[in-house]
Structure formats: structure tokens, C-alpha cells
């Protein structure tokens, strides 16, 4: 095992900094692997999960630390079959409550989608395998139908002189399952099991394609969303519209630019450094520090349904300050205590129990002995 000093000497400050950040985050875990909404402890567990999410972001001063942790958790979930059933449940629940929301808030849909499907596989195995089987039953028929639509849309867009990449994609299992549960429907009653995605070069092209599509297919009222004019809080942008297909079956189309697609797939990671191709020549574009900070400020707006504007502004203020008004600490049982700025070890002790505070004689912070009023 290498010390931080040895790590720094061998690999440099940057690598040591990342390892230190990832090491600190390894202690983050939920202490209870079950969360039944009817359980009297459900509210406490949800509060603990929210504290853990905030602590996760507050501790990771470098966004790359979070990206490493997400990649590490994805690897853990992919190899979860080798764990005991109890460990599978605990890790999957922890992933669903902590890591999936963080991937969502960072806009990294590729990781979020795979994590959600893997969580469903271990938390709701009966529903998962039943859904997999039912989706597979009509796969050939559905693929033929999707390809026919894609070919038609390609022709319409090409005839208008717009350069575009067009393809069909299946919705992931957890999103289908969530819709079935929320809408109390069977899979046969869920019509949008797939979507057609259209990638173009410019924003004007997005709206031009939308006009073409609405001319060729009848749009369903109330099913159009303009996330280009009004991006989601994680910076996701696209035009979404649901239409009636040739056979009368509804289908969804998403229209976005290549840059929007990169953001939708990789979120904040796409905005650090990425390769562009201009006339066949690869170039590297690096986002400025100001743009990074602007991005971070926006993604830290927690995606929650606020009961009023005051509640939203209070939450927004704390997030824009990167949780600078909070001190997070672990109890011996693994719970997270969210304390006000300026709190000392003695405050933490009393937050656990008055008996703990009364008997406290010393404290250790980040591995070092400190006074109780540190």
C-alpha cells in the first residue's frame, strides 16, 4: 500500500489528488439496504440518501473524482452476480439511491441508463425478467416497423436538403417499468417502447426537421417538448414530439444537434475536453474554467419538485455555494450528519446523543487528533 506522499512522488500531484478524493468517497454508503415506502424509517433513509448525495458532491472538489467513482460503481454493478444475494440488494439499493441521481444530475445518461437497468435486475428481478421476456417477444416485428419509419424519415429529411443522422433506439427497461408502475399500465398499453433520434448540425436544422416531421405525420396534442429553448436543469437539450405512425401506432422522435447529443450522452464529461471533426480534421476543444463553473452551478440545481419558489431558492442558494454552509460527518453506525457551517467535533457528538457529547474527551478529523472545539 502506498502513502499519499509516495503516490505523489511516483505519479505526480494530479494523480495523488484524484486518488485522495476517490479514497475519501469510498466510505459513502447507505446503512440500510431496504426502503419500503410504508416503512416508518423510509423518510429517515431518504433524508440520509439526500445527505449522502450532497456530501458526495461537496467532498469531490474535482469533478473527475465523481466521474471515476461513477465508472467504478458501474464496474461493480456489472460484476454484481459474483456477490451474495444480500450484498447484491445492498449495493443495488445504494446505487439506485446515490449514484443514479448523481449521474442524472451530471447529465451522463449512458451511465445512468445502464445503472438503472442493473439496479432493477437485482432489486426487482421478477419484474425485470418478465419485462425482458415480453419485450423480446415482439422484437423482430418492432425492429421491422422501426426500420420502416427510419427509412421514411430519412427520405423526407434528405429531400429537404438537410444533412442528418437518423436511427431508432429502444427505451431502456427501467424507464418502461417506471412508466408501467406510475401509469398503472401493462406493457401492451405502453406505446412508446422505442424512439427515433435525428442528429443535425445546427439549431435551425432542428426546427426545420420538426416542421417536416409534423407535416408528414400527425402530432399528438400535448406531447411536444422544446428542451432546446428551455433546457433541463442538467443541460439536456432536444426537441421531443410524439406522432401517429402509418399503422396508427404512436411513436416518439427526438431531434438534436451533434453537440447536444454529446452533452445528453456524457453530460459534464463532454464539456471538459472533447474532439471535434471539421472537414475531416480532428481538433480538440477545451472548455474554459468560467464555462466549467457555470456548468457546475447549473447541474447542482437538484431536480426535485419544489412545493413553492421559496423552497426552490433556498435549495438553489445552498447548491450554488457548493454546500459551503454545511459540515458533513459520519456517525459510528454510518449515518451522515448534516451540520451548519462552523460546527465543531463537540457539536457533532451532541448531534448523535447527549450522552456521547457529555463523555467526549477528544476528536480525530481526517486522521488527525484535534481539540473538541476544532
Residue ranges: model-predicted function:
Residues 1-195, 200-251, 256-320, 325, ...:
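Active-site helical microenvironments for divalent-metal-assisted chemistry
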Residues 307-341, 346, 351-374:
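Ubiquitin-like/PB1-type beta-grasp interaction modules and other compact soluble beta-rich domains
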Amino acid at each position: 500500500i502506498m502513502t499519499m506522499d509516495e503516490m505523489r512522488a511516483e505519479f505526480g500531484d494530479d494523480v495523488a489528488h484524484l486518488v485522495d478524493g476517490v479514497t475519501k468517497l469510498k466510505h459513502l454508503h447507505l446503512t440500510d439496504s431496504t426502503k419500503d415506502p410504508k416503512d416508518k424509517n423510509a423518510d429517515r433513509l431518504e433524508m440520509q440518501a439526500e445527505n449522502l448525495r450532497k456530501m458526495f458532491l461537496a467532498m469531490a472538489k474535482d469533478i473527475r473524482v465523481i466521474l471515476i467513482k461513477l465508472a467504478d460503481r458501474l464496474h461493480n454493478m456489472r460484476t454484481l452476480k459474483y456477490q451474495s444475494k444480500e450484498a447484491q440488494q445492498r449495493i443495488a439499493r445504494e446505487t439506485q439511491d446515490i449514484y443514479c441521481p448523481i449521474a442524472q444530475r451530471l447529465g451522463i445518461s449512458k451511465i445512468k441508463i445502464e445503472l438503472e437497468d442493473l439496479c432493477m435486475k437485482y432489486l426487482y428481478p421478477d419484474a425485470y425478467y418478465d419485462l425482458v421476456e415480453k419485450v423480446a417477444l415482439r422484437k423482430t416485428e418492432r425492429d421491422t416497423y422501426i426500420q420502416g419509419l427510419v427509412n421514411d424519415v430519412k427520405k423526407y429529411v434528405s429531400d429537404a436538403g438537410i444533412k442528418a443522422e437518423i436511427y431508432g433506439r429502444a427505451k431502456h427497461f427501467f424507464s418502461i417499468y417506471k412508466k408501467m408502475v406510475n401509469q398503472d399500465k401493462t406493457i401492451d398499453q405502453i406505446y412508446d417502447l422505442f424512439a427515433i433520434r435525428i442528429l443535425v448540425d445546427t439549431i435551425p436544422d432542428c426546427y426545420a426537421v420538426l416542421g417536416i416531421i409534423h407535416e408528414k405525420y400527425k402530432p399528438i396534442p400535448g406531447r411536444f417538448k422544446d428542451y432546446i429553448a428551455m433546457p433541463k436543469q442538467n443541460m439536456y437539450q432536444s426537441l421531443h414530439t410524439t406522432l401517429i405512425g402509418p399503422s396508427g401506432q404512436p411513436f416518439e422522435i427526438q431531434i438534436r444537434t451533434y453537440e447536444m447529443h454529446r452533452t445528453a450522452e456524457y453530460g459534464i464529461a463532454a464539456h471538459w475536453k472533447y474532439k471535434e471533426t471539421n472537414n475531416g480534421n480532428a481538433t480538440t476543444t477545451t472548455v474554459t474554467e468560467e464555462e466549467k463553473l457555470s456548468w457546475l452551478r447549473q447541474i447542482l440545481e437538484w431536480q426535485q419538485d419544489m412545493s413553492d419558489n421559496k423552497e426552490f431558492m433556498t435549495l438553489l442558494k445552498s447548491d450554488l455555494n457548493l454546500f459551503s454552509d454545511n459540515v458533513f460527518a459520519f456517525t459510528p453506525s454510518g449515518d451522515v450528519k448534516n451540520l451548519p457551517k462552523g460546527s465543531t467535533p463537540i457539536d457533532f457528538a451532541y448531534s448523535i446523543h447527549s450522552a456521547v457529547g457529555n463523555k467526549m474527551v477528544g476528536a480525530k478529523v481526517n486522521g488527525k487528533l484535534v481539540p473538541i472545539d476544532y
